[in-house]
């Protein structure tokens, strides 16, 4: 029996190959980073080069699900279907957010919509005639009490809460950077939190800020996509800080 074709059948050694293939596809997608600060949550995504005549707004990988929740996803943009997978998940999540608001009268919590997305993905791992969604997502936002949240889901339908995390092809390098550099001091202010995300992305992104897409959400404020000029300003400050640190090291060495 070909166990990699049967989505609902475990192989003798306990694998669901279609789910594992979807997880491997995510590892080839654009790198995305999420960091939870004190009063801010920041999402950063590696931006692929856009064709000269293409509208950049149609290739964004960060989107709002509701007034208090947004999401970034890692997909293989060059493979047919996977970016469309993200669109399906986003549309269903938005409908659920609207339905919850109409029924209950309050916006969803970040964990609620994360659990909904994870459950949707999980159903597609055990249904005949379907295949797993080829996307992983970082979901951020604020709860009623103003607490910032960051969650990550994968194609299998599992989800976890994080202080900082990365998905996509550069996830391993970025996660190692975050493990070394994520401290209370590193997220003391909004600007420091934004810089931490940019520094993490610069570990794997070439050509500096022009290949970075960045979004911030502050307490009681809507999602804001940073302009290329704002991102370049932060990158310039980071480069200046690096130069100053190098000079200090050279002085100590001499």
Curated annotation (Swiss-Prot):
<dbReference type="InterPro" id="IPR029055">
    <property type="entry name" value="Ntn_hydrolases_N"/>
</dbReference>
<dbReference type="InterPro" id="IPR000426">
    <property type="entry name" value="Proteasome_asu_N"/>
</dbReference>
<dbReference type="GO" id="GO:0005634">
    <property type="term" value="C:nucleus"/>
</dbReference>
<dbReference type="InterPro" id="IPR001353">
    <property type="entry name" value="Proteasome_sua/b"/>
</dbReference>
<dbReference type="GO" id="GO:0000502">
    <property type="term" value="C:proteasome complex"/>
</dbReference>
<dbReference type="Pfam" id="PF10584">
    <property type="entry name" value="Proteasome_A_N"/>
</dbReference>
<comment type="function">
    <text>Component of the 20S core proteasome complex involved in the proteolytic degradation of most intracellular proteins. This complex plays numerous essential roles within the cell by associating with different regulatory particles. Associated with two 19S regulatory particles, forms the 26S proteasome and thus participates in the ATP-dependent degradation of ubiquitinated proteins.</text>
</comment>
<keyword id="KW-0007">Acetylation</keyword>
<dbReference type="GO" id="GO:0042802">
    <property type="term" value="F:identical protein binding"/>
</dbReference>
<comment type="similarity">
    <text>Belongs to the peptidase T1A family.</text>
</comment>
<keyword id="KW-0597">Phosphoprotein</keyword>
<comment type="subunit">
    <text>The 26S proteasome consists of a 20S proteasome core and two 19S regulatory subunits. The 20S proteasome core is a barrel-shaped complex made of 28 subunits that are arranged in four stacked rings. The two outer rings are each formed by seven alpha subunits, and the two inner rings are formed by seven beta subunits. The proteolytic activity is exerted by three beta-subunits PSMB5, PSMB6 and PSMB7. PSMA7 interacts directly with the PSMG1-PSMG2 heterodimer which promotes 20S proteasome assembly. Interacts with HIF1A. Interacts with RAB7A. Interacts with PRKN. Interacts with ABL1 and ABL2.</text>
</comment>
<dbReference type="GO" id="GO:0005737">
    <property type="term" value="C:cytoplasm"/>
</dbReference>
<dbReference type="InterPro" id="IPR050115">
    <property type="entry name" value="Proteasome_alpha"/>
</dbReference>
<feature type="modified residue" description="Phosphotyrosine">
    <location>
        <position position="159"/>
    </location>
</feature>
<keyword id="KW-0963">Cytoplasm</keyword>
<keyword id="KW-0325">Glycoprotein</keyword>
<feature type="glycosylation site" description="O-linked (GlcNAc) serine">
    <location>
        <position position="136"/>
    </location>
</feature>
<protein>
    <recommendedName>
        <fullName>Proteasome subunit alpha type-7</fullName>
    </recommendedName>
</protein>
<dbReference type="GO" id="GO:0019773">
    <property type="term" value="C:proteasome core complex, alpha-subunit complex"/>
</dbReference>
<dbReference type="Pfam" id="PF00227">
    <property type="entry name" value="Proteasome"/>
</dbReference>
<dbReference type="GO" id="GO:0005839">
    <property type="term" value="C:proteasome core complex"/>
</dbReference>
<keyword id="KW-0647">Proteasome</keyword>
<dbReference type="GO" id="GO:0043161">
    <property type="term" value="P:proteasome-mediated ubiquitin-dependent protein catabolic process"/>
</dbReference>
<feature type="modified residue" description="N6-acetyllysine">
    <location>
        <position position="233"/>
    </location>
</feature>
<dbReference type="InterPro" id="IPR023332">
    <property type="entry name" value="Proteasome_alpha-type"/>
</dbReference>
<keyword id="KW-0539">Nucleus</keyword>
